[in-house]
Structures are given as C-alpha cells and as structure tokens.
C-alpha cells in the first residue's frame, strides 16, 4: 500500500505540472493567434452581381499592390455579390455589415438614407452622397435578337407597347422583379416615363396614380413571361434558350457583350431606347456606420483609389462597362456592334432619377398593379 502510494504521488505531480505547462503553452499560442488576428485589418465589400468579374480581378490586383506597399500591414477583404435591393434590406436588417456598399445605381442611395434615418432616428446619414465614388456605368438597354428586330424595327418603349397590342405578334418579354433587382426597378421607371411623356426626374405621384398610365403599363407588361431575381440570370437564359423562349429582355449593356455572339438562335443586340435610358453608375460608398473603424476606412479609401486608377478602369471596359471619366477611351473591339451587339457611341438622352423620393418608394407598388399574372 505504502509503496503503491509513493509511486502514484510523483505521477500526479508530473501530470499536474505537464497540464500546467500545456495550458501555458496553449494559452500563449492562442494569444499569439489573437494578436495576429487583431493586427489584420478586415473589410467587407458588398457589390451588385453584374460587376463580379471586374471586382474579382480588381480584388486580386489590389491585394498584390497593398502587400507590396505595406508588407507589415496585413489586410483581408470579403467580397460578396448581392442584388441591389437585397443588399439594402440586408443592411437595414443588420444581416450584413459592409465597409463598402456598391449597388448597381445611385438610385438606391437616397433610398437607404431615408430608410436608415426612419429606422435609427439618427440624424447622421449612413451615406454621404457627395462622397460616393463613381467610376463606371452601364445603360439599361432592350435586348433582342437581330433577326427579330429586322422584322419589327423596335426603337424604344413606345414601339414595344404597340407590338404588345398586336395579337399577331408573339412577344415574350422579361425583366427582373423591381422589388429585388436594380435593372427591373429602373426599367419600370423608364416605362412610366414613356407612358406619361414626362421626363423621369419630373415624375410625381400623380403620374403613378394616373389611370391612363396604369392602363398603358398593364398593356406593356402583358407579354412578360418571367420576373427574375438576377439580371445576369435573364441574360444567361436568353443566351441558352434562344428566341423561341425569350425575345425581349431589359438588361445592362455590358451583359449584351457577354452573350451577343455566343447565344443559341442567332445574335443578341442592344436597342438603345429612343426615349432615353437610365444609367447604372455603380457608386462605391464607405458607410458611416458604427461597425466601420478608422483603420477599415483607411483600407477602404485605398481600395477605391485603386479602382480609380486608369489601368483598373481599363480592365472594367473589357467587361463592357463604360468609364465615367471621358478621358479614358473606349476599346472599339469591345464596343463593336458587329462583334458584340453594342454601340460605340450613345446617341440617346440620358434619363435622370426621379427627384421625388416618394415616387421611388412606390414604383414597386405600381408594378404590382401592372404586372402580368
């Protein structure tokens, strides 16, 4: 008994000693990891999905540039493509907390500011509109098949409306759900402007409630076969399914470049509405939110400065985007009607966002009254 007891005691002491050493080593290692994690500056960028290819390229190039210039400052960036409306709702619901928010269009910025103020009762706006960085844009266009347009000579919204009234023409149209996606939202604004004959920036609530306008829109929407969540999906659907399934879609110009020459059933072309078009100007906004630290803002500002570099902008042009800076020339091999179905010059009016925020808030309600069942 005594012998056995004497043997167990040093084992117990050794065990406790080893446990203590293990704890100290493990705790030190954990602290080292935590210190390393605290030393890394992490930002999150939420952006509209149609610019994913460009953003992926820009992200890779920026990380390389940052590491070369700041070898002792570690950063990490999470990149998340979202629908513009979806991301706005996610911010308001605190589901996402981006450092940089880049919806497809500036049309969403006053939206978020208004809803943020109502939700938080905070006098400070979450977006400083004057500080939004705009680098590229893409107009909303009417996508159709070249052969289809050779027959029907579509020039804009009014022509499409007339075709919808002709029972002998089988129009199969699509745009995205304006409650979820920027392109559908902007398309409904453009259609209302055409219906009322009112410049889009001057649209009022009277234009939305006008029975004649509502009738026109109902006729216009009558040929819709789907309302997608993603503009990119509509482009891919048009490309893969051909003109028998979808012969009219409202897309971004840059997506026409992606699908024009490789689509089943012929060539897809962009029609630039004679009434004018809204531009998706892809603003980049560093949010004024409590989750954005000064260190994160510093990295975010560096990223936006990098995006503004001419070489970075020129990369975006290869994906079919146009530069905000007029001194940066277009590539005629990209903006080439014969090759990619898109024009080099834009010879149509640029429409503006409605000045009345209430109009913006009610556009989706108007669509719900008018949409095809």
Could you say what each language-model-derived stretch is?
Residues 2-17, 38, 289-373:
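Extracellular/periplasmic juxtamembrane helices and adjacent flexible linkers that interface
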Residues 147-155, 180, 193-202, 290-299:
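Short helix-loop capping/hinge motifs at secondary-structure junctions, enriched
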Residues 52-56, 179-197, 202-206, 210:
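Bilobed "Venus flytrap"/periplasmic-binding protein-like clamshell domains
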Residues 52-59, 63, 85-88, 106-109, ...:
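Extracytoplasmic/secreted envelope proteins and their assembly/folding machinery
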Residues 124-130, 134-142, 211-224, 228, ...:
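Periplasmic-binding protein-like
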Residues 193-272:
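Ligand-binding pocket segment of bilobal, Venus flytrap-like solute-binding proteins
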């Amino acid at each position: 008994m005594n012998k056995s007891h004497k043997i167990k005691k040093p084992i117990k002491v050794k065990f406790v000693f080893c446990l203590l050493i293990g704890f100290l080593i493990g705790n030190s290692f954990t602290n080292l990891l935590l210190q390393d994690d605290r030393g890394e500056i992490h930002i999150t960028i939420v952006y509209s999905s149609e610019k994913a290819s460009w953003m992926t390229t820009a992200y890779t190039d920026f990380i390389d540039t940052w590491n070369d210039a700041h070898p002792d400052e570690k950063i990490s960036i999470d990149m998340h493509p979202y629908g513009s409306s979806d991301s706005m709702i996610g911010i308001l619901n605190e589901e996402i907390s981006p450092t940089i928010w880049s919806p497809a269009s500036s049309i969403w910025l006053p939206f978020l500011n208004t809803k943020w103020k109502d939700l938080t009762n905070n006098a400070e706006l979450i977006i400083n509109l004057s500080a939004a960085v705009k680098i590229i844009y893409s107009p909303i266009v009417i996508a159709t098949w070249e052969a289809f347009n050779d027959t029907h000579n579509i020039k804009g919204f009014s022509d499409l409306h007339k075709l919808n009234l002709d029972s002998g023409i089988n129009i199969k149209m699509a745009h995205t759900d304006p409650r979820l996606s920027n392109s559908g939202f902007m398309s409904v604004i453009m259609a209302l402007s055409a219906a009322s004959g009112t410049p889009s920036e001057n649209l009022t609530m009277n234009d939305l409630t006008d029975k004649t306008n509502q009738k026109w829109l109902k006729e216009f929407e009558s040929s819709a076969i789907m309302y997608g969540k993603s503009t990119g999906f509509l482009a891919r659907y048009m490309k893969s399914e051909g003109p028998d399934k979808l012969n009219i879609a409202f897309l971004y110009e840059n997506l026409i470049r992606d699908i024009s020459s490789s689509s089943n059933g012929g060539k897809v072309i962009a029609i630039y509405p004679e009434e004018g078009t809204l531009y998706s100007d892809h603003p980049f906004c560093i949010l004024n939110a409590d989750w954005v630290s000064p260190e994160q803002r510093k990295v975010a500002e560096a990223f936006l400065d990098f995006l503004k570099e001419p070489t970075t902008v020129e990369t975006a042009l290869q994906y079919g985007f146009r530069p905000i800076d007029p001194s940066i020339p277009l590539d005629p091999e990209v903006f080439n009607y014969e090759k990619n179905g898109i024009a080099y010059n834009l010879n149509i009016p640029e429409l503006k966002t409605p000045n009345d925020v209430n109009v913006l808030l009610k556009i989706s309600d108007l669509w719900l009254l008018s949409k095809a069942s």
